[in-house]
Design a protein with these regions (language model features):
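Phosphate- and other anionic-substrate recognition elements at nucleic-acid/protein interfaces
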Residues: 1-171
């Protein structure tokens, strides 16, 4: 797991850097934060015992993130409503996509044929993103965190923060 540093600043001044939070939704959810340069800042997997515990934790997850300008989610749309409620209150754009959206952009057709192959490929690509972002290599990487990393990569490309998939990550 990467260091959980949520405060990112622009080098030229003291304004918060734009950030994008990607979430693989579930009671075991993956989280990945990207900076305005399109690089991964941190990632993690969090487990919540039930929906009530998740709902209570959302404020604590979002509050320390400086410059949060977008939340991109994939997965359980009912759980997405919990995140969206706070995002709407704080006027942070929030979007929910299907897995097929980021998989189509980032994975080869043959890697999309089964969920298991897609998850294995996501793990490999997420590790490449971690390395490209100059973060320490994980000893283990949960599939929800790996998928959040790729959801976020899709998001920063869509936001125009990156022109495309970095060569170090491309398949």
């Amino acid at each position: 797991m990467a260091a959980d540093q949520t405060s990112t600043r622009n080098e030229d001044d003291d304004t918060p850097e734009e950030t994008l939070l990607a979430i693989d939704l579930g009671l075991r959810c993956g989280l990945a934060l990207y900076g305005g340069d399109g690089r991964l800042r941190w990632y993690r997997s969090s487990h919540f015992a039930n929906r009530a515990q998740l709902k209570k934790a959302i404020y604590g997850i979002l509050r320390p993130i400086d410059g949060l300008s977008m939340i991109l989610m994939e997965g359980d749309r009912e759980l997405a409503t919990f995140w969206r409620k706070l995002a709407d209150k704080w006027e942070i754009p929030c979007k929910t996509i299907g897995a097929e959206v980021w998989r189509e952009q980032l994975l080869l057709k043959r890697e999309q044929t089964s969920g298991q192959v897609a998850k294995e490929t996501a793990d490999q690509m997420a590790r490449a993103v971690i390395s490209w972002s100059d973060l320490p290599s994980p000893t283990s990487l949960r599939h929800d965190a790996a998928e959040a990393i790729l959801i976020g990569l899709h998001g920063v490309i869509e936001q125009g923060w990156l022109e495309g998939v970095p060569d170090a990550v491309a398949r």
